[in-house]
Design a protein with these regions (language model features):
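N-terminal glycine-/charge-rich "phosphate-binding" loop or analogous flexible N-terminal tail
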Residues: 1-70
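Short, hydrophobic beta-strand segments that form beta-sheet elements in well-ordered domains
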Residues: 3-6, 31, 73-75, 94, ...
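Phosphate/diphosphate ligand-binding glycine-rich loop within oxidoreductases
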Residues: 7, 69-150, 164
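Short, polar loop motifs at secondary-structure junctions
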Residues: 10, 78-79, 199-204
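Short gly/ser/thr-rich secondary-structure transition/capping motifs
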Residues: 52-58, 75-76, 151-158, 209-211
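Acidic, amphipathic alpha-helical patches
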Residues: 60-63, 81-84, 160-163, 210-211
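Alpha-helical segments flanking ligand/cofactor-binding loops in enzyme cores
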Residues: 64-65, 107, 186
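Rossmann-like dinucleotide/phosphate-binding beta-alpha-beta segment
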Residues: 142, 160-211
C-alpha cells in the first residue's frame, strides 16, 4: 500500500506521515507540502478554496510526481482538484483531515470510484467551548461592558439585567444533540444547570444517560 500525505503551513507532511504509520503500520509514504509564498497567500488561497472549491487553489506540482501509483491520499487544506484526481489512477481513498471537504473535488472522485472521507468532530471541542463562552459573555455582558469601558464609561445596568445573572440553576435549551451538543451538555454540568434537549433524531435513552 502506498499513501501520499500532503501537508500545509498548519499541518506538516511529517506529522501526517507519523499519524499514518501509527494507524496503518509500516506502509510506504510519500510526502509533499503545500508552501505558498507567504502566510498571506496561504490564507487567501485557503479562503478562495472555501468559497469556490478546489479549482481555486494552487496545489504543489510535486503531487504529480507521486500520485500516479498511490492508493490513498491524505490532505488537510491542500486543494485536490479534478486534475489531481484524474491522475490518481490507482487511488481508492482520499482523506481530508478536517471537518469539511471543500478542498476536494468530490464529484470527480466519485466518478472515478474514489471514496472521500472527512474528519467529523475534529473541531467539536473548539465549537462547544466557544458556545459556552458566548453564553457567559451574554449573561455577564462581557462584550458590552468591554465596549463601554473602552469609551471611558462604567455602565451598571444593561437591557437584559432583568433575566441574566449567575448560570446557577438556569434552564438551558439545546437544539440538536449530536457530538457537539453532547459536549456542550457535558461541559455545562459544572455550572449546575438544567438542560433541555430537542432533537428529533436523538435517542431518548441516550439523552437521559447524558444527564
Amino acid at each position: 500500500m502506498k499513501v501520499l500525505v500532503i501537508g500545509d503551513p498548519l499541518l506538516s507532511s511529517e506529522r501526517l506521515e507519523a499519524a499514518v504509520k501509527k494507524i496503518l503500520g509500516d506502509v510506504e509514504v510519500a510526502r509533499v507540502d503545500w508552501k505558498p509564498a507567504s502566510d498571506e497567500e496561504f490564507w487567501f488561497l485557503r479562503s478562495e478554496v472555501e468559497k469556490k472549491g478546489p479549482s481555486a487553489g494552487k496545489p504543489p506540482v510535486e503531487i504529480f510526481d507521486h500520485v500516479g501509483d498511490i492508493d490513498i491520499i491524505i490532505t488537510h487544506h491542500t486543494p485536490i482538484n479534478a486534475e489531481i484526481v484524474t491522475a490518481a489512477k490507482k487511488c481508492r481513498i482520499i482523506g481530508a483531515c478536517r471537518a469539511g471537504v471543500e478542498n476536494v473535488d468530490v464529484a470527480a472522485a466519485s466518478k472515478q470510484g474514489i471514496a472521500v472521507f472527512h474528519t467529523m468532530g475534529r473541531n467539536a471541542h473548539a465549537v462547544s467551548d466557544y458556545t459556552i463562552g458566548l453564553m457567559l459573555a451574554e449573561m455577564r455582558n462581557i462584550g458590552r461592558a468591554h465596549a463601554e469601558l473602552k469609551q471611558g464609561h462604567w455602565k451598571k445596568q444593561y437591557s437584559n439585567a432583568a433575566f441574566v445573572g449567575d448560570m446557577l440553576e438556569k434552564k438551558i435549551g439545546l437544539v440538536g444533540f449530536g457530538y457537539i451538543g453532547h459536549l456542550v451538555a457535558k461541559k455545562l454540568k459544572g455550572f449546575d444547570v438544567e438542560i433541555l434537549v430537542y432533537d428529533p433524531y436523538a435517542n431518548a435513552a441516550d439523552v437521559e444517560a447524558s444527564g
